[in-house]
């Protein structure tokens, strides 16, 4: 069985917890895009694990794969592995040799470019975009290259002059391109991980041939997709379910399930339009109650009411077969709760978002109001344990999305999850 899991909003939907819940049933968990600009948090008992590159299934001693659609900072991965090993965890990790490497010059160029912008886009300055540019331009350093000094030397002889020139023009220090200490550190990590190299496409397809269970884990969310997101305020990779097939080298006919993770409200970190954003005390309350600060950057997330207009588009973009609704507990205590069911733009009612980011920024949300609930739901074990108003809210979201909700998260811990029949 091949299952894909993606975020249905702007990222930070709680995918880490949902993957962690599913991982126990799967043999392989594979990351298919993004880099360490995305973070996911998993809570088990009194321990919290913050991961950026290692797939969430690490807590169950599963086979973990990083596919060639990922851009990888070796130092970040190595630090994560050291932390996990220090906790006594076994990490059975495979990395595709074609995985693009985020080089120090990518990080430098990212910071210089963002500094020069008159209008910021909110990059994490981790070199993600520039690493993807090099992938498309066929000027990338790949994982295989940092396992062999001669391979890396030849690659840099080819691409370094242009990088040095570009950084100099941007006002930076071009010496970062061939910094010997940095390159030596990369090569040491590459040699240490050489035995972890694997053909990810081959491994997954063979596993599926043997009727094994494979879970493809996405990063970010639908509206950060480089094509279908809110350009230019997006990430540099393809975040929707279709990219799992392309990036992992698995034919689309092999997909069995696509799980969308959606928060009971909506958040966004960085710049870009978000029609239901709450710039008031309710937005502040959601941020504090939900702990809405970036796993990677620590930046406060912008919070807003649930947006079913974007939700409907996310369903189309991903082909969801089921949904996981997270952070329902954060809404506890609100007297009235709103759901955006349409937009108004220049006097016209829209039930589907406009393609233009400029027009989306001008959309005014059309809301339905629902009664809130005051009872704590964090210890609810069954759907019937939820207050009537909470159930009504869940059912309205399911109706608007037109996809069954299979699980509801009522707290950060694994056991704080309600499974629907």
Swiss-Prot record:
Amino acids binding substrate: 295-301
Residues that hold IMP according to the record: 12-15, 37-40, 124, 138, 220, 235, 299
Required co-factors: Mg(2+)
Cofactor binding comment, as recorded: Binds 1 Mg(2+) ion per subunit.
Cysteine pairs bridged by disulfides in the record: none
Primary enzyme class: ligase
Main location: cytoplasm
NCBIfam families for the chain: PRK01117.1, purA
Family: Belongs to the adenylosuccinate synthetase family.
Name of the protein this chain belongs to: Adenylosuccinate synthetase
Lineage: Archaea, Methanobacteriati, Methanobacteriota, Stenosarchaea group, Methanomicrobia
């Amino acid at each position: 069985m091949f299952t894909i899991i993606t975020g249905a909003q702007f990222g930070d939907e709680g995918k880490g917890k949902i993957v962690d819940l599913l991982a126990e049933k799967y043999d392989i968990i594979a990351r298919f895009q993004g880099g360490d600009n995305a973070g996911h948090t998993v809570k088990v008992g009194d321990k919290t694990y913050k991961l950026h590159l290692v797939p969430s299934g690490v807590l169950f001693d599963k086979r973990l794969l990083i596919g060639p659609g990922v851009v990888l900072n070796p130092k970040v991965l190595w630090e994560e592995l050291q932390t996990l090993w220090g906790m006594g965890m076994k990490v059975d990790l495979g990395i595709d040799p074609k995985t693009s490497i985020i080089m120090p010059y990518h990080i430098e160029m990212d910071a210089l470019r963002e500094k020069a912008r008159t209008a910021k886009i909110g990059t994490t300055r981790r070199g993600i975009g520039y690493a993807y540019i090099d992938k498309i331009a066929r000027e990338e350093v790949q994982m295989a290259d940092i396992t062999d000094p001669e391979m890396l030397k030849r690659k840099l002889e080819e691409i370094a002059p242009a990088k040095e020139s570009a950084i100099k023009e941007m006002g930076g220090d071009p010496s970062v391109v061939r910094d010997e200490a940095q390159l030596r550190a990369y090569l040491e990590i590459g040699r240490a991980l050489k035995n972890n190299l694997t053909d990810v496409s081959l491994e997954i397809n063979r596993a599926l041939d043997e009727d094994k269970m494979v879970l493809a884990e996405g990063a970010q969310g639908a509206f950060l997709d480089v094509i279908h997101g809110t350009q230019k305020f997006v990430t540099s990779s393809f975040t929707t379910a279709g990219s799992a097939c392309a990036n992992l080298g698995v034919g689309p006919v092999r997909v069995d399930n696509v799980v969308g993770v959606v928060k009971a409200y909506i958040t966004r970190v960085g710049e870009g339009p978000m029609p239901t954003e709450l710039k008031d005390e309710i937005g502040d309350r959601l941020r504090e109650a939900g702990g809405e600060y970036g796993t990677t950057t620590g930046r406060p997330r912008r919070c807003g009411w649930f947006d079913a207009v974007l939700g409907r588009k996310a369903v189309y973009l991903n082909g969801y077969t089921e949904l996981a609704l997270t952070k329902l507990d954060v809404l506890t205590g609100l007297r009235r709760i709103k759901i955006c069911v349409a937009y108004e733009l220049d006097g016209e009612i829209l039930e589907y978002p406009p393609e233009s980011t400029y027009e989306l920024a001008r959309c005014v949300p059309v809301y339905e109001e629902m009664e809130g609930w005051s009872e704590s739901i964090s210890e609810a074990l069954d759907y019937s344990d939820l207050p009537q108003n909470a159930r009504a809210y869940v059912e309205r979201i399911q109706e608007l999305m037109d996809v069954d909700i299979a699980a509801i998260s009522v707290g950060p811990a694994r056991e704080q999850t309600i499974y629907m029949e």
